[in-house]
């Protein structure tokens, strides 16, 4: 009896999560027109560009190394900045906690179409333990790398907005065409 009840509850849970469109977060399905693109960055071997390249590859995007190609879309990583602000302090006035902010500016150039700007911001808090200076530095490096990976994931997910904005633009152009023809 207990086994049947467990099977029933498990089956209902699977049906409910599948029915509502829930999916485990995995790779992002990049639109077909962005399945092949040029990745352009001022620091092509830097940690942020490597993280973006890795996320694109995980999403089955073919990265072309020829930056002179004008017939395929181009993802340009324009700039990134890391800032660190004090969030709280100890009684003696030393910093107890930081908020680290990573901001990434990029743009996608579609051949023969518009330029689509993308911006990603990632926030993290970091506890500054003055008693463990070496461990603090190692932990801060790990947090920075996680922030870069998270920014790269968000950037790849934002590629979906380009497809959506192109569809809206195409719909607007198609609805404007019959209206203009009727006026003539």
Curated annotation (Swiss-Prot):
Functionally, this protein is described as follows:
Together with LptD, is involved in the assembly of lipopolysaccharide (LPS) at the surface of the outer membrane. Required for the proper assembly of LptD. Binds LPS and may serve as the LPS recognition site at the outer membrane.
* Organism annotation: Pectobacterium atrosepticum (strain SCRI 1043 / ATCC BAA-672) (Erwinia carotovora subsp. atroseptica)
Q: Where is the signal peptide?
A: 1-19
**Membrane disposition:** Lipid-anchor
Q: Note whether DNA damage occurs among the keywords.
A: no
Report quaternary structure and partners: Component of the lipopolysaccharide transport and assembly complex. Interacts with LptD.
Task: List residues with covalent lipid attachment of type N-palmitoyl cysteine.
Answer: 20
- Can you locate the S-diacylglycerol cysteine lipid attachment residues? 20
| Principal localisation | membrane
Q: Where in the cell is it found?
A: Cell outer membrane
Would you identify the family this protein belongs to, as annotated?
A: Belongs to the LptE lipoprotein family.
* A single GO cellular-component term on record: cell outer membrane
One of this protein's GO BP terms? Answer: Gram-negative-bacterium-type cell outer membrane assembly
List, alphabetically, the Pfam families matched: LptE (PF04390)
What keywords does the record list, in alphabetical order?
Answer: Cell outer membrane, Lipoprotein, Membrane, Palmitate, Signal
Q: Which GO terms describe its molecular function?
A: lipopolysaccharide binding
Please give the NCBIfam families that the UniProt record associates with this protein.
Answer: PRK10796.1 (NF008062)
**InterPro entries from the UniProt entry:** LPS_assembly_LptE
Return the protein name: LPS-assembly lipoprotein LptE
* tRNA-binding as UniProt keyword: no
């Amino acid at each position: 009896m207990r086994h049947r009840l467990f099977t029933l509850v498990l089956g209902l849970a699977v049906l409910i999560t599948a029915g509502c469109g829930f999916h485990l977060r995995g790779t992002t399905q990049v639109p077909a027109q962005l399945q092949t693109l040029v990745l352009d960055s001022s620091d092509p071997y830097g940690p942020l560009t490597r993280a973006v390249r890795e996320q694109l590859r995980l999403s089955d995007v073919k990265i072309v190394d020829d930056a002179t190609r004008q017939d395929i879309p181009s993802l340009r990583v324009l700039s990134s900045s890391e800032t660190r602000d004090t969030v709280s302090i100890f009684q003696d006035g030393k910093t107890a906690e930081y908020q680290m902010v990573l901001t990434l500016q990029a743009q996608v150039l579609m051949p023969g179409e518009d330029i689509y700007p993308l911006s990603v911001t990632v926030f993290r808090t970091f506890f500054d333990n003055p008693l463990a200076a070496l461990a603090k530095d190692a932990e801060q490096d790990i947090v920075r790398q996680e922030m870069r990976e998270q920014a790269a994931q968000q950037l790849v997910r934002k590629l979906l907005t380009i497809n959506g904005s192109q569809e809206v633009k195409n719909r607007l152009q198609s609805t404007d065409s019959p209206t203009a023809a009727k006026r003539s």
